[in-house]
């Protein structure tokens, strides 16, 4: 499809790729994007309506919730629970799955989401976003159970995010590549602006929080040290570091112009070997990156192959340019020898 196509038209055209499609999924995606428009508007108006700052509560992760975390979470729940497309929902901000109201028919999909990734940055105007993952319910027409959500990332039927920054963008994939849409506020519609986004196999940019260097395992320390040595080191070229501190913003940059993102294994707390949540962040972003020609790994395991052990499981994440990710994996395996 061509640049300038509306999201509504794009969804209809894409639905035709699936013989026998009922239209349920198209309806689900349209309803979800409506909630993303609402959240984007709240983010942009945050300081004007007193929506910035802490809500005075913690989420299941033990993290301080921002007011916009709660607003965004409620926006998605209330936009989606009445539609009849879903059997259940799970949110990073909630301990347990969210049940569909009793008077609403149960659908055949499950929605998992991080309502406002990077919300700690809202007070300083840095890009944030909503990340989502859609799975098929193992049994359609009944209430979703906890085990239904614990599917490996390869089972996702759709993944994406909405980015709230200099513009409101929606980026998603249903397994036919990655496409990006920009919200035209004059008509209230997302318009195709980034067709078939691709990640180059090689890169000279990396994203990592260098302040944690001493806590990483040796393979990651080796990899980053070599990048920092630039032309004087074994890579024999210079690399640039970019770090926003908002995963959705860092991954968006990689989808637009390439790079590698690392939030590696951290040895400070054995109970939290990684910071990022498998179901709400790692799986959907890994799906997008692979669809764009990149790779995603924990350092030892392909992320999309991991069978979740719980709703809020955390893992290390290394994703982006295929050749760079494979190099980091090889360092973990001890199989990469400098020529």
From Swiss-Prot:
Coiled-coil regions, chain positions: none
InterPro entries: FBPase_C_dom (IPR044015), FBPase_class-1 (IPR000146), FBPase_N (IPR033391), FBPtase (IPR028343), Fructose_bisphosphatase_AS (IPR020548)
Domain of life of the native organism: Bacteria
Keyword DNA damage annotated: no
CDD domains named among the record's database cross-references: FBPase
GO molecular function, one term: fructose 1,6-bisphosphate 1-phosphatase activity
GO biological process, one term: fructose metabolic process
Catalysed transformations (reactions): beta-D-fructose 1,6-bisphosphate + H2O = beta-D-fructose 6-phosphate + phosphate
Comment on bound cofactor: Binds 2 magnesium ions per subunit.
Amino-acid positions noted as binding Mg(2+) 2 in the UniProt annotation, renumbered to this chain: 114, 117, 281
EC class of the enzyme, as a word: hydrolase
Predominant location category: cytoplasm
Pfam entry (one): FBPase
Enzyme Commission no: 3.1.3.11
Cofactor(s) required, per the database record: Mg(2+)
Keyword Protein transport: no
GO CC, any one term: cytosol
Cysteine pairings via disulfide bonds: none
Location in the cell: Cytoplasm
Cross-referenced NCBIfam families: PRK09293.1-1, PRK09293.1-3, PRK09293.1-4
Subunit and partners: Homotetramer.
Name the record gives this protein: Fructose-1,6-bisphosphatase class 1
Organism name: Acidithiobacillus ferrooxidans (strain ATCC 53993 / BNL-5-31) (Leptospirillum ferrooxidans (ATCC 53993))
